[in-house]
Amino acid sequence: MEKFLFYLFLIGIAVRAQICPKRCVCQILSPNLATLCAKKGLLFVPPNIDRRTVELRLADNFVTNIKRKDFANMTSLVDLTLSRNTISFITPHAFADLRNLRALHLNSNRLTKITNDMFSGLSNLHHLILNNNQLTLISSTAFDDVFALEELDLSYNNLETIPWDAVEKMVSLHTLSLDHNMIDNIPKGTFSHLHKMTRLDVTSNKLQKLPPDPLFQRAQVLATSGIISPSTFALSFGGNPLHCNCELLWLRRLSREDDLETCASPALLTGRYFWSIPEEEFLCEPPLITRHTHEMRVLEGQRATLRCKARGDPEPAIHWISPEGKLISNATRSLVYDNGTLDILITTVKDTGAFTCIASNPAGEATQTMDLHIIKLPHLLNSTNNIHEPDPGSSDISTSTKSGSNASSSNGDTKMSQDKIVVAEASSSTALLKFNFQRNIPGIRMFQIQYNGTYDDTLVYRMIPPTSKTFLVNNLASGTMYDLCVLAIYDDGITSLTATRVVGCIQFTTEQDYVRCHFMQSQFLGGTMIIIIGGIIVASVLVFIIILMIRYKVCNNNGQHKVTKVSNVYSQTNGAQMQGCSVTLPQSMSKQAMGHEENAQCCKVASDSAIQSSETCSSQDSSTTTSALPPTWTSSAPVSQKQKRKTGTKPSAEPQSEAVTNVESQNTNRNNSTALQLASCPPDSVTEGPTSQRAHTKPNALLTNVDQNVQETQRLESI
């Protein structure tokens, strides 16, 4: 028996060891079971946690989300700690089975919003800790199931508001921490029923005022001992931009000397300690109406806008009183805006009278009267005006175009109502309307057209005669949907008042306007064409300049190798001067020839070189060879020699002979190299001129010239 109990004990221990998650510590303190998994590096909630766990600690891990199955069937769980994780998402109804949960710690995570069903099923939750998250939004019904809360901590978040209606129902709440948020308003009466509340912390928000509440009258601090009485309500509101006027006078009258709250406005009290300012300096400025409409006259059926602006401290609220003495509120025919503007969408004769604008704040009120005159439309005589047509009521466009069958005629046929008005033509800015309805309404004065756009709810009214069958609506926006209604303004035969009746409504959309796009495209194309044409012209000029430069460079290069033109060649066969006769030679040869012309004593060498050239090139074409050389040298030597003989004095015979011999020896070597160069060149390298052409036809004359050159050379040697 003892062995059996021992084995049973071992089996129980083994089962317990298997149920406890890895890395966690399970404490069995009968009848409670605690599972401690803090600081274990967990990425998710362990799936094998004992469902009978009473206390579960999962703090300081890396859990990112909570799923529905993580805490399923844990009905005994009382305390759940999920602090200091990275939780950013909680599945709806994730805590639905935790009906006995008393404390839920979700502080220091990454939650950004609280949805409707996140805390569903937590009807016994007393402590909800959500501080140090990134909350920006709390759903209006998120706290509906946690009405038994005693402590709610939402501090250190980014909340601008919270569901105050849900807070108002938490009658068991005793601690509310809202510090370090961006809350700018607390509705009046929020804490009226929270009699158990002992601490409210709204430090470091954007509150300019606190609403007076009977709960705050318990906010007292014992000046002598500094101990808070159990019945005392602790209020912390430091770090807010308080506007110290008469609205905070109730708070100043509390005995609080230990806090250091300061005023942010008005300018006279900026930076001063709240509790040190005398009560008589908490002042308010009574309202003063600064701008208003003096008098207005409008045609019956048109729109009337009355304006009233006031200033004061605090900002005054503006109300309107009708000529009958009734408070005007938002209705189908009238709108009251927050800035003090009153809009009467469709005026009637009974709207004539004095409208009163009332601006009020805690310091007082101011009034201003404005006269509205409705110009009555002329009545048309009609024998059937005793027939009573029922007034369908309001004629504002929101009722006639947005409410389905209400926009139809009195028989309720919407399709027939739309068929009564047809858009014949619609462009980007205009629409042509055609009226197909029968004018059987007695006493019709005129028709009123009213329309607005999808993006602009401002009504536009047009009045047209009752005989009109078409109407052109101008100044419309392109690509915009319009709701348009036609109303008949007629005389009520029984009441003798002007009544309106919806004849028909239609919805249409204007065309898209592409004119500006095409215009911009045409401008773009025109500019592009100008740029292209200009580019072509510039490119053409550049190409022309480049061509000229290339041609000039080529001509320059050719000029360096250009053949020398030798003119005025005299024939030695007949002694006559040949006009226009020339022989072309390479530049090197022309330079040598010119040098020989300058020096008369070189004629002999030139003749020898010409003879040598003719002998070495005898294998080439005889016409080319003979045309290249002889005439050039025959023209220079005799002429220059004759000039020397005339101008120069005749020296002795021996020096002259030695000089000629030296010159002959020097020029012979030079011209021999020239002759060899000419002989080694191909025949095509020598350009044929007119003289060479004549040389082909007269070979005997050339031979005669050569013989004469030889004779002349011998004569010079003998001298």
Curated annotation (Swiss-Prot):
Residues 414-503 form the Fibronectin type-III domain. Residues 18-51 form the LRRNT domain. Glycans are attached at N339, N452. Its main location: membrane. Gene3D superfamilies: Immunoglobulins (2.60.40.10), Ribonuclease Inhibitor (3.80.10.10). The chain crosses the membrane at residues 530-550. Keywords: Disulfide bond, Glycoprotein, Immunoglobulin domain, Leucine-rich repeat, Membrane, Repeat, Signal, Transmembrane, Transmembrane helix. Pfam families: I-set, LRR_8. GO terms for biological process: negative regulation of inflammatory response; negative regulation of macrophage activation; regulation of presynapse assembly; synaptic membrane adhesion. Residues 383-416, 614-719 are annotated as: Disordered. Residues 240-286 form the LRRCT domain. Can form heteromeric complexes with LRFN2, LRFN3 and LFRN4. Weakly interacts with LRFN1. Able to form homomeric complexes across cell junctions, between adjacent cells. Does not interact with DLG1, DLG2, DLG3, nor with DLG4. Cell adhesion molecule that mediates homophilic cell-cell adhesion in a Ca(2+)-independent manner. Promotes neurite outgrowth in hippocampal neurons. This is Leucine-rich repeat and fibronectin type-III domain-containing protein 5. It comes from Rattus norvegicus. The gene is Lrfn5.
